[in-house]
């Protein structure tokens, strides 16, 4: 990882336009590898702030970040497509100070003061992209695996947004499409032609972690771990079978990638 955010805000006077160009450069130079397992503290250090909410549009670093969870006790209903290339991310509720029962009121796009909430900021950016008025926002996606343990799912483009009724109220849905040039690919493989890794389903990740005991299957290390496809997706492998996913440390993950190339 390389911290290269210094001076970003001085070089991007407009809300859109130059910010996206500068942001892409920053993301290319500093990130985790796709599928890398990290601690909460590592994640916060990488993003330069203590992440306390799930939706974070344009942090001080210039990056946009979302935190997701598909655990049984997750507050929101996020979904991953069967091919692992699209995440449908649910917007966030009103705060307890704004509603007695947040799950019973529409997810807000504006605060009481009239400023945009995180829902509103993401929705506005998606509509700008949908109408071809700006490039898609690049979003870093982290998924909670266990308390204190996270996985970097990759860099995604915010392509669309809409509202739907969940039976009680209207909720926002944000469509994130896996970038064909994710920042994670650069660390795992220098080959620009290598197809982008797909997101591994959450239940598969948890089962693999349990089976492999939270350590590299080749050397037993417990740090710098990655979820690795035994047979790569580009060679016919799949992300949905536990049998095709294993835990590897960074060294063995990179060694395997170099052999494949």
PLM regions with names:
Residues 2-151:
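Acidic, glycine-rich low-complexity segments with interspersed aromatic residues
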Residues 65-69, 174-176, 216:
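Generic recognition of long tandem-repeat/solenoid scaffolds
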Residues 125-127, 181-215, 239, 243:
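Short, charged surface segments at domain edges that flank catalytic/cofactor-binding sites
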Residues 141, 217-218:
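A structural signal for short, well-ordered beta-strand segments and their strand-loop junctions
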Residues 219-247, 260:
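Histidine-centered nuclease catalytic patch
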Residues 250-261:
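Long, charge-rich boundary regions
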